[in-house]
């Protein structure tokens, strides 16, 4: 809309009717004009509608139910059935709670508290893999932290808020996305208090770190320097609310079973005395399943920290059969990975005989490294073969026996008369 006054063409907003002198900016279109105030109003209307649609989508989005979560975990993690069930329920409830918060505007509605998770199990039992698989399944930001590198703020070492900084980096400093992520803190047992009694001296890497983690795990607004770096008084910070971040803590807790036994098994003399089991390895998992908060406090975690981790899942020590399953059954099993790698070397087949798989599993048991040690055993067994194969012609198949795993003889090479298949790029 326009009109001439004193030789000057006066322009008006086509929506609100204000003149160009009454507004800051007037934008022209084909025979129409819109002012900055109307643009801002339109943006507000669109923003509200988009937020409403996104909240509805979030509420209706396909959050897998515990049974479905368990089935997906089964594809990657062998055994640990009870731990998978506990994790499936805990993670489902956590993200169901977030979806309820997204669509709820009633201030009087019952507030659902967050339940963080503690995983207890020996090295190589699958604690880290469970957390990684859950994050991948739910498509949320995931970050791992090592508790042994953490210290209190002001001391040499890694500040606990650095964990949130890593989470922000994973999602390109999108605070909203980071606030729905998963943080896995490994080796949490290594920050246990050195004795039952509070120390007179400062314990900056033990009880001090537990105190520093308390608020972060429970829920606080962490101030993180943008794009990393150290904090400076005059710089702007990215504010991240940790209330809805799911924290999963894991640790081996060596010696915890002794504390549980001491509490649960009664000593005595005569006919009424309880007989203590001498086969500690056999019922190791059963003992750990009986863990109580008081046992964790006795181990060295402060009561407030134990209280922030209400969901406790214990993982079994892996036996020979479980290790063989780990080698062969999961979607990304190690044997499948090496078979694919050999097939890339001109279509060569790689076969592991049953005795070879047993030998690999036994080696891992001797090393007490669980599933984590399987790859290094395979690398050692296949090193010479992987070194020689690219220089050999017409190899069709490589067979691995228990003697190859033990280092007695080299793997068996089966040759073909046909020329080698060209390598794929």
UniProtKB/Swiss-Prot annotation:
Amino-acid positions noted as binding Zn(2+) in the UniProt annotation, renumbered to this chain: 13, 16, 35, 38
Keywords: ATP-binding, Chaperone, Metal-binding, Nucleotide-binding, Zinc
Alphabetized InterPro entries for the sequence: AAA+_ATPase, ATP-dep_Clp_protease_ClpX, ATPase_AAA_core, Clp_ATPase_C, Clp_protease_ATP-bd_su_ClpX, ClpX_bact, P-loop_NTPase, Znf_CppX_C4
Membrane spanning residue stretches: none
Superkingdom of this protein's organism: Bacteria
Its job: ATP-dependent specificity component of the Clp protease. It directs the protease to specific substrates. Can perform chaperone functions in the absence of ClpP.
Record's subunit section: Component of the ClpX-ClpP complex. Forms a hexameric ring that, in the presence of ATP, binds to fourteen ClpP subunits assembled into a disk-like structure with a central cavity, resembling the structure of eukaryotic proteasomes.
Name recorded for this polypeptide: ATP-dependent Clp protease ATP-binding subunit ClpX
Native organism: Nitrosospira multiformis (strain ATCC 25196 / NCIMB 11849 / C 71)
Native organism taxonomy: Bacteria, Pseudomonadati, Pseudomonadota, Betaproteobacteria, Nitrosomonadales
